[in-house]
Amino acid sequence: MLTSAIKKQIRSSFEAAKIQLPNFSNRSSQNIMIAEISKTLSGEYPKSNPILCVEAPTGIGKTMAYLISCLPIAKANKKKLIIACANVALQEQILYKDIVEAKKYSSVEFEYALAKGRSRYVCIRNLINLTEETSNTQTLFEDALLWDEPPSQNQINKLSEMTDNYSSTRWSGEIDDLESPPEFSLWQKVACNRFTCTAKNCEFYNDCSFFKARKKASQADVIIANHDLVLADIINGNNILPDVNDCIFVFDEAHHFAQKALAHFSINASTEFMKTSIRQSQSAIDQISKITNQKTSESHIKKVDEAIGELIEVITNFEYLDDVYLFDMSGVSSDVANLGKNLLSIFNTAFGNFLDQKDNWQDYCKRNTVKQIIMDNLNNIIGQNDQNLSSIVSLLNAFTQNTHTDTPPTSNWIVKSKLPNKKINYHLNTAKIDVSNHLQSLIWSKAAGVIFTSATLTSLGSFDRMNQQLGLKEKENRYLRLASPFNYKSVDFIVANIKASPSEVFEHTQELARELKKRINKEAATLVLFASNSQMQMVADLVEKTIECELLVQGEYSKKRILEKHFEKRKNGEGSVIFGLDSFAEGVDLKGDNLNHV
């Protein structure tokens, strides 16, 4: 029920926002959004679920609308408010600007925290182990997962830099807080993951950036997350976020949510990954046997190689379109299914043997004293292998499964890629094409409230497509389309007269660079958005030395640092150019003289 006390808090927050926020503009569409969110979440529509879909065009002030309306209701009902964004840019916009402003004008006292997946945080144990000089105890692991090949000097320097910065508290342990993040392959070796994490059994538990962040999130009233984290956490049993029924969810940029959900119900693994994984798991088993003085279990490397060879003999003859072969909706062909089941049987046996050895190792550690560095490194290797073998078994299980007529079919396909040694790698993929029932049972039927909002939720003016993808029923929920505050009819849309087609990569890139050199004002603020990362890098190389002002390229710095540098340049009256991918613009607030040209 929308009580008089809650109404008063909402009105008080709105009036305070008018005073506290510079350049505040009263928009009727924002007022309607606040009212409808409040009514929906408070049960003012008894025949509807507490679910509202709001299409709110750019400029309405969506974030303020859902903060003003959701906060008092969440607090009054002792629920957590989960704000889930589609990308890091919007997440940081809310964290560093919108939520800070809300603390000033909100009539409700609240604490907030940022929640990210484990992989965004460093594992300090792994970082220290990799940074330390190689000792006799570490030679045992030379051929294991910690290093696929000897590290370069740059990698060693980067590890030392991260260790020093973390030890001196100059770095929080989040990859997004690094001014210059390490390459992905290096970060993977030091990032947290649930398979290698020993939680409270780790000597660095009290200093762990991930568990510090999780503790802060557990104490917060508002948790800022992203779509991927919410989906992963709910699917895996709420390890980071509160129980679904204790939460009110706001999915911002919700037009991305259906695609994100599909991705979380898809699996893939390549033939080369399978070969590498079986070898690495056997290496781990051999290391366990050597330390525990037990007989090593049977190797399955030869059987896996032979089974994969037989599978490749069949799939190499398929007719691929742009290196992709798509099976029909009845599932994979019988010959591929039989070969896949044979491979699955081998991996099931190998995985079972591996888990037995894992148990033996854990029992051995309980009964014997093992050097900490040996235990840490081997636990890390075991965790990685556990994850790899588990994912392969899941993939083969789903890939070879018979299609049932009473359930939505799955999509199965193979993608070819060429390795540096010119060898062909085959990626097996399987994905559900309809996850609406899963979303309904996991989230919509349990949540205390759900708000979907974006500038683009409808297709041809209808919410039907969104309802179909997310498993929502129009008669059971609330829907709202708001008018734009901008007069788009007065705006011209101009397409540059670029002669080269985008398919002519070299010519198009050269012409694009020439046009940008002509168009970029060295004294102004410019944002250039690309659909291709590789083209963005090439154009940056071509224009960097001639534009005579700061060029900030996405990927070279964190988004937060790029914006800080950009604002600093503009404050000093200097020109600044940002090169980013298309998603960079979502959630980035560049007002006034901070953006002159897109």
Predicted regions and their residues:
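Walker A/P-loop NTP-binding motif
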Residues: 38-42, 63-77, 97-101
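Signature of the SF2 helicase/ATPase Hel1-core->accessory helical subdomain module
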Residues: 66, 72, 89-92, 96-100, ...
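Conserved interdomain hinge at the start of the Helicase C-terminal
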Residues: 498-531
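A substrate-engagement module of RecA-like helicase motors
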Residues: 2-18, 25, 47, 58, ...
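Conserved helicase motor "Helicase C" RecA-like lobe of SF1/SF2 P-loop NTPases
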Residues: 531-555
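Walker A/P-loop
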Residues: 46-68
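A contiguous, basic/glycine-rich beta-loop/short-helix subdomain that forms a polymer-engagement track
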Residues: 188-218, 234-240, 361-492, 496-499, ...
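A short beta-strand element within the Helicase C-terminal
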Residues: 590-598
